[in-house]
């Protein structure tokens, strides 16, 4: 299914398949990608297991390579890319990001007001984001020179209880902030 939202389009499909992107994008190239791939940490959401979140490192790398390669084919030469990820899988994400043809420009940190409940020694009140662009291109930057790599936005309170069903829902102001820096 493809939904049109003004000039934008959203598809529900398999990001590892080129035909998903071909159906969504046609000949149009994206100016920005902001994605939240599975974190590969075996989490559950309100409706059960998150698809592909239980993959091992090798399978996770192969999954990301397919997705990132498909994304690159449909991104403008001067586009930017934001990828949210889990710190415990940093190497998998960075390796796939770079091997698929992207340059890492920065690691950004979204500082959350509180840590979600997790059965870990350290509670993560932050979420890392890879910021980058195509190695064969450049990127646009519209932010000033005062932007820091750590920023704080309120999370979505009780997102799972309110029916969002995602253990780490992203607040709209956070996404709007990221978009405004590059488009």
Explain the meaning of each model-derived region:
Residues 1-183:
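Core catalytic lobe of class I
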């Amino acid at each position: 299914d493809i939904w049109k939202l003004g000039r934008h389009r959203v598809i529900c499909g398999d990001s590892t398949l080129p035909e998903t992107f071909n159906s969504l994008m046609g000949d149009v190239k994206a100016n920005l990608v902001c994605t939240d791939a599975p974190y590969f940490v075996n989490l559950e959401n309100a409706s059960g297991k998150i698809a592909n979140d239980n993959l091992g490192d090798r399978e996770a790398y192969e999954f990301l390579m397919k997705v990132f390669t498909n994304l690159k084919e449909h991104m403008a030469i001067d586009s930017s890319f934001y990828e949210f990820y889990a710190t415990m899988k940093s190497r998998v994400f960075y390796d796939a990001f770079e091997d698929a043809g992207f340059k890492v420009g920065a690691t950004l940190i979204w500082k959350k007001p509180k840590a979600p409940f997790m059965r870990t020694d350290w509670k993560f009140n932050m979420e890392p984001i890879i910021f980058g662009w195509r190695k064969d291109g450049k990127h646009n930057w519209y932010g000033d020179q005062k932007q820091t790599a750590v920023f704080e936005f309120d999370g979505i309170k009780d997102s799972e209880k309110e029916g969002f069903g995602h253990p780490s829902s992203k607040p709209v102001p956070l996404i709007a902030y990221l978009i405004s820096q590059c488009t």
